[in-house]
Amino acid sequence: MKISICILLVVTTLAVYWPTQDHEFINYDDKEYITENWNVKSKLTQDSITWAFTTSHAANWHPITWLSHMVDYQFYGSNPKGHHLTNLFFHTANALLLFFILFRMTGTLWQSGFVAALFALHPFNVESVAWVAERKSVLSTFFWFLTMWAYIHYSKKPGVKRYSLVALLFALGLMSKPMLVTLPFVLLMMDYWPLRRLRFEQDEGPEEITENYSGKKLEFWHLVWEKFPLILLTTGSSIATVIVQRSGGALQNIEAFSLSARFTNAMVSYLDYLKKAVWPEGLAVFYPHPGNALEVWKGVLCAIALVAISAVAIKFIRKAPYFAFGWFWYLGTLAPVIGVVQVGGQAMADRYAYVPLIGIFIIVAWGVPELLAKWRH
């Protein structure tokens, strides 16, 4: 059955996104990243590789992403078909990795397949796949999932070699897109559910996992300390990102967007992402930031709603750990791009939801069957 689900994921993903191979490059960042970037068009040379690791071009430091574009140009030149197919390859691989990761952690076939299918086919993710310049999203997520896989392997039998692989894959992900700064937080949540490396005495949650961790229940602060090397990598990546975004003029100052405008937009955006996830209409390449035109009371109401949902998630964390895991995955992974630290002039962006919505998909996949089972009884 696992093979059937994998085949179905591959076939449906390719069927939906195959037309992208006939798309051209566009004038929104594709020039800056590929068609008019002479370092990328130089292909893989000593100078271009050095440039990839030292440049702040496009107000980002993501050398692995630059190298991937150079490899594409090495094989496909200026033909956009190959560049689009590379994005599609990574997105398809990501869907398969997500399925295997969830299945390995939880042992539940259909829920894992459902989450992977939503991830593969949700309209919110079209921007990340169909836009060549957004290679960094699909590439960094590829390393995100590989890091999770390596961490699961490490949790079964902790050791330096296994942890080194986790750190290496995490570093490659950070060098693809700094969105991975929240991954140590996700790994810590995984320690509670589904890996069960941390468990309270009164836990009542389901025992999906028996063989996929070391069997040792560890103290919370021990697990936090375990993530310290990853936190160091996160800190370094964050500092580098702030420096290059500030030097590139992407980081907005308080005069451009006040603190109240940032807070209000951030709170409203959290719920707007959810609304578009449920009913994906009005998707756009750019959502202008409303600035002070957005009433503060809307932000306050949205903040109250977010706190209320978070309180419910914590209250039922032992009976429904998947709900807390999915909800805080969503809140946490979206936090770096929610707009408190404002980069650019957008209020939100479809590409920012590529990883965060996985948390919501997990809530739906595990929550709906559980609710239906309770209603039947």
Task: Label each PLM-derived region with a short phrase.
Residues 1-377:
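Polytopic membrane enzymes that build or remodel cell-surface glycoconjugates and lipids
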